[in-house]
Each structure stands twice: as structure tokens, then as C-alpha cells.
Amino acid sequence: MFDSTLNPLWQRYILAVQEEVKPALGCTEPISLALAAAVAAAELEGPVERVEAWVSPNLMKNGLGVTVPGTGMVGLPIAAALGALGGNANAGLEVLKDATAQAISDAKALLAAGKVSVKIQEPCDEILFSRAKVWNGEKWACVTIVGGHTNIVHIETHNGVVFTQQACVTEGEQESPLTVLSRTTLAEILKFVNEVPFAAIRFILDSAKLNCALSQEGLSGNWGLHIGATLEKQCARGLLAKDLSSSIVIRTSAASDARMGGATLPAMSNSGSGNQGITATMPVVVVAEHFGADDERLARALMLSHLSAIYIHNQLPRLSALCAATTAAMGAAAGMAWLVDGRYETISMAISSMIGDVSGMICDGASNSCAMKVSTSASAAWKAVLMALDDTAVTGNEGIVAHDVEQSIANLCALASHSMQQTDRQIIEIMASKAR
């Protein structure tokens, strides 16, 4: 719990980070459906015999090609089945952390028997939507999640409505901590990072602990596309230099390899995404280690990275056609620039160069190849920092980048929020045609 005597704005920053930076086991879109199924199963009278689920097109996109931890299988059906048969309804994004070998076997058997179906919800105006309905004979329970990966808005059984969330904030309720980010600036975030007591932000070191463990697993195992392990081998062969730049890419992509390959270790997520959490964490950790930073400097750099990533992502839809590893890496660029230089000008220049570099990267669903995009984003972030240290950056005379970094961020987010909606529909259409 943080010090209540802190500046109220700083309290809201800390609350925003605590809300958005959480442990998550498995890719968060399938996990969101697994959570809905687990909560529904907890409400059901008797064991689950059948599972029906409906998801938004975006959630379907991000669930088609990703491995569910511990199962060796990809896709939403196994996530729904395992959530229903082995999920911990009280564990949030770690819903599958207690799944046993027997539960996994039972989930696969349920799937093989044709007792699990997952369809796109039509019509669906929500970007993030999952609904799971579980059956025992004629008895059933249904749970709906909307807007956020763990935001349960409705629980119903054959006996009637158990819970429904109010659509709006009523008088006397506090607004979401994220709301304050729409009224803040990067300069204010930097002031907070520089001046907040270390004790109030020490908790962010947990992101380094979790994501470093995931990175180590990625280097030691044959996970996903094993990009990190492959690049490390090429260093040993002399085909790639073993330096700070390659270490950033190797250790960051290794964590994503393990994450997307189905390792049973949690990631510390950011904005509902494990890969965003990895991208906001690992480059900063590697640079901090290179410079021998102590825990306090690491915590401040991680707080700047994670809060900047949240600040940018708060201007985006929760899921979109824009690969959000890029925006998380903008946070990482801020954190790395702070470690090396500390000046606002260096941080803002690095972010501007990132927007001029990787802003066109699309999200074509969660899969092993996400680690490729994570590695690209991490590399671009360090390149942008190196440019900024030499007083060089993409300027407001070029493309969507503006002279002011805040406007550059707004321009990027406007593209993702509006113009790229058709891109998203085309991506989903292509992926759906492959699945048929």
C-alpha cells in the first residue's frame, strides 16, 4: 500500500500502474475466455459437460494461433475447456495457474468429444468481448467479460441473474485511475519518476523478477520460434556481436518466445498484454545491468517505462490493428534513455524516432511470431535512444511525427483508433478464411 501523504496525482499514477501491470499466465485473450469459463463453472450446479463460447472478432484474432500454457495446443477452444475444468475462478489473469495434468487431459477429452464450441459474437460492437456458457444436463451458467480482460459484467445461471455490472460510474464512486492519464503529460510523468519516494514504487521491481525468469526459460527451452536462443547461438558462432544491443534483443525476445510458446511461467503484463509487459521491462533491465544500476534506479526506470507505455496505450483501443509491442517499446525507450541520460529532451526525442520508425507494424493476432515483433520493437527502441544521445531524432517535418512529442503520440493513436479499423477488419477476414 502506498503512502497516503503522497501528491494525489502521484497516487493516481501508482494506482494506474498497479491496475495495468499484473502477473498473467498465458496470452491474455485466450486467458480472458478461460476466466469467463472458470467463473461460469464455479457458478454451475454439478460438473461441466459442455462449453459454448462467443468472442469479439478481435479476441478471436488474438486467440487463433497462440499456445495455451501446459496444453501444447493452440486456440480458444482448449482455453475455454481448460478454464471450465481446471481454472481458478479467483485468480484473474493467472486463472490456469493451478490446472492439473488431469484437468488438462479432461479438457482435451471434452474437446475431442465435440463438446466445446467457440464462435464470433454477431453482432458485436465491443473490441474485447468474451462469453462462456457451461452446461450440466439442462442446468447452465453463463459469464460475460467486456472491455477489459478480467472485467466481468454479467453472471447468470438457469436460476436467474447472479450479478450485473452498472454501465456507468454512479455519484460517489471514484473514476478509474487511468482517467487521470488523459489529463497528464510525459513531462509530468518524468517529474513523478524523479521525485517519488522509492518505497512507493519498489513493487515495480516484481516486473523484472517475473519477466527475467520468463526470459531465462526462453533461452533454455525450445519455445515458440526460439528467436532469443537462436540469436544467442549466432553470437557464439561469431555471426552476431555479443554486445549491449544484441543482449537487449536476445533477452527480450526470449521472454516472448517462452510466453507465446506456452511456458507455464507468468509474465508481468502491461495494459492487459504479457508481450507489452515484457517489452516494457526487459530492455530496461538489460541496460540497467549494463550500467550497474541499483534497485532504486532500476525501479525508477521501470516505472517510467511502464507508466509511459500505459499513458500511450490509454489513447488506443484495448485491441487494434496496431501492434502494441511498438507502443510498449516507446515506454522502454523512455526508461533506457532515463538510465543513460535522464533528460526529458532525450526521452522525447527517442519516442519521436520510435513513432517515425515502427508505427506501421500491424497486429495479425497472437502467435509465436509476436516474438519477432517484440524483438524488432526492442531493437528500434535502443536505436532511437542512441540517436537521441547524439541529439538526432525524426523531426516534425517528417510523416506523422510532430514537433511536439505529445502531438506525435496523438497522431499515432488517432491512426490506430480510426483509420486502421478497416485494416483490422481485413486482417480478421484473412485469418478467418485460413481457419475455415
Curated annotation (Swiss-Prot):
UniProt-listed InterPro entries: Ser_deHydtase-like_asu (IPR005130), UPF0597 (IPR021144)
Pfam families in the record: SDH_alpha
Origin superkingdom: Bacteria
One Gene Ontology MF term: L-cysteine desulfhydrase activity
GO biological processes: L-cysteine catabolic process to pyruvate
HAMAP family: UPF0597
Family: Belongs to the UPF0597 family.
Protein name: UPF0597 protein YhaM
Organism the protein comes from: Escherichia coli O1:K1 / APEC
Gene name, Swiss-Prot/TrEMBL: yhaM
